[in-house]
């Protein structure tokens, strides 16, 4: 995709995967190890729906819809399931078909009260699915996913407008949560 910066400069941003067709064996080998979350605490290569095209039959066959309990970052859970079910996909590396503009009000950049609860729900729903699959062990990625969102939420608390005491209280609640302890 084309990343458009605030001052108007732009550059081509690509995923750290090779261009071309991925069959199920290649998906298991190359994509599954980072499907949900990479070791570097970055999203997996398929976790944004805005840079993927899906066949309607595929979505219907696997009953893929957005999780109505996950209000923010819902493309993460959707794309993790889609990536798991995919028998193949084709990556057009080097094609800037989408222009991504910086938006300071997005959930990834702005504080949202209740975001931690939403992310815990998302992680719980991911566990409900991936804990029952047998062809790959996603447990470490699920833990990294929880750690990523804890860091994300704690970083955004500083933008909340809350007092320093309230910010500390919110951060302690996240740090002491059972969900993070299990990660």
Where are these regions (language model features)?
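Membrane-interface aromatic/basic loop that binds lipid-linked glycans or pyrophosphate carriers
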Residues: 128, 158-183
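Active-site catalytic microenvironments for nucleophilic, acid-base chemistry
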Residues: 84-85, 129, 156
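Residue-level preference for long, well-ordered alpha-helices that form the structural scaffold
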Residues: 115-119, 163
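Short, charged, amphipathic alpha-helical segments
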Residues: 117, 139-145, 167-172
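Amphipathic alpha-helical repeat scaffolds of TPR domains
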Residues: 143-155
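Donor-binding/catalytic cores of nucleotide-activated saccharide
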Residues: 1-116
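C-terminal, non-catalytic tails of nucleotide-sugar-dependent glycosyltransferases
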Residues: 121-141, 181
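Amphipathic, well-ordered alpha-helical segments in soluble domains
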Residues: 92, 122-125, 149
